[in-house]
């Protein structure tokens, strides 16, 4: 049984259906890359998995099944238990999601205390431990910093640390490398792969970067205007697909010496 199944899902804002008949599944320890142009519905789909569709959007058809149960039928209390523990999300710019006037440690401790009945001192120590596990040296200094005092790569690693605090089975990543320079992008991508290898974490990554999608994804889903127009194993999408839009995306990848590096 797949860890996650998205079955024929429509997502609507009022009477406007913006995501139409989307289906995909994800097995334990698998990485799925969702690619497509801006506005294609990629982010909306993964937000639906976590019950966090922005702007009043709702799932109006289909179902989202996680470990055999419908996420659309969860109570608020069940969502609180699930978010963070079983399913976590990494945002495009984790630093922008943090309160700029609070120490990172204060925000992190507050997050931990929503999930565990422990002392603030123990929560702080846990935050330091997880941050250092994410290859950020001197976790206590990071915890005592404000978000604006860190580089983009450091902020993103803090976001990954917070998302991985309870070693969730499913990690949703929304354009996690788009605001970073190429070197830092590569470091973050490698870190995601290590998380999968070390913890068996399943990952859905939304990206417009086909190179990132191809490097990370066991399977690739291609979206356009709110619909899935192509999907399959990585090798199929990159080398065998006859879908015109998939070919268009591949043709847009820069070449060097006549060779395309995806």
Whereabouts are the PLM-identified features?
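ABC ATPase "signature
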Residues: 231-232
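The feature captures the beta-strand-to-loop junction immediately N-terminal to the Walker
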Residues: 35-37
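Conserved ABC ATPase "signature" region
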Residues: 70, 122-141, 250-251
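A short, proline-enriched helix->beta-strand linker immediately N-terminal to the Walker B motif
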Residues: 165-169
